[in-house]
Design a protein with these regions (language model features):
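N-terminal organellar transit peptides
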Residues: 1-118, 122-128, 133-254
Length: 254
């Protein structure tokens, strides 16, 4: 009798599927600014990158941060989830850890699902490649973007070696931006090194229209336009899948 009771107590544990555990984990992550926007037609995952992108070191208390160890597994789950039709990335970030920001940008860029980025407020520093990473990028009229050289904090040991590392890192950032947008490397480097726009730094602050004119962002627009583009991309993806399926079936018959 006791054995039967113990078995029945354990049954609910065995009943929990891997899919249920995944959904539970995603529910926990919603507290970090993510949500699924769904209706009868489609399901789009929305994630936000706000404050600073936190990397290998913890930021001081009182600073808003986006933790890359939260976003990376979430992006993987979005790519693998057949129930999610696309990704909307909302950006209002001052930048942050370069390697962490590029890691997030690389994952977004390598996803097969439709993706749209929307710059709200600002997408500065490493936020620029994050905006360019999506398949389509938008910026609201009141937002801005800042381009500046790579910087480091703290003591530097070996000036020549450190400078070479920063130069290579900056080149990687420029290559990423240019390979995922219409921007030209020569112009991006020029904007990064302008000495006349900021009092304490080199660089350029771009208004929304300027970001589009330089090819960094695709167009000026808001939430409605971003969702409309996602729907168009989802419909085109479905058409392509149907065509491939039809050709595959035709090949099997032949």
């Amino acid at each position: 009798m006791e054995e039967t009771e113990k078995r029945s107590e354990k049954e609910p544990e065995r009943a929990e599927t891997a899919q249920e555990r995944t959904h539970a984990a995603l529910s926990d992550l919603r507290g970090y600014g993510t949500a699924v926007a769904e209706n009868r037609r489609e399901h789009f995952q929305c994630i936000s990158v706000i404050g600073q992108v936190e990397g290998h070191y913890l930021l001081p208390d009182g600073q808003k941060a986006t933790k890359y160890e939260h976003l990376i597994p979430l992006l993987v789950s979005i790519e693998e989830d057949d129930g999610i039709d696309g990704l909307l990335v909302m950006l209002n970030t001052m930048g942050g850890d370069v390697e962490a920001g590029l890691a997030i940008a690389e994952i977004i860029a390598s996803m097969t699902k439709p993706s749209v980025s929307l710059v709200l407020g600002g997408s500065h520093s490493i936020g620029v490649p994050l905006a360019a990473a999506a398949k389509r990028s938008l910026i609201v009229p009141s937002a801005s973007m800042t381009l500046h050289p790579v910087r480091v904090n703290g003591m530097i040991v070996g000036v020549e070696q450190s400078f070479r590392y920063m130069r290579e890192m900056q080149d990687r950032i420029v290559r990423f931006i240019c390979s995922h947008s219409r921007a030209k490397a020569e112009k991006i480097n020029e904007l990064m090194m302008r000495p006349d726009q900021m009092a304490t730094d080199c660089g350029t602050i771009l208004e929304a229209e300027e970001a589009v004119a330089y090819g960094i962002v695709d167009e000026v627009g808001g939430l409605d336009r971003a969702l409309s583009i996602l729907r168009e991309m989802k419909a085109k993806r479905s058409e392509n899948k149907n065509e491939i399926s039809s050709l595959s079936k035709k090949g099997e018959k032949d």
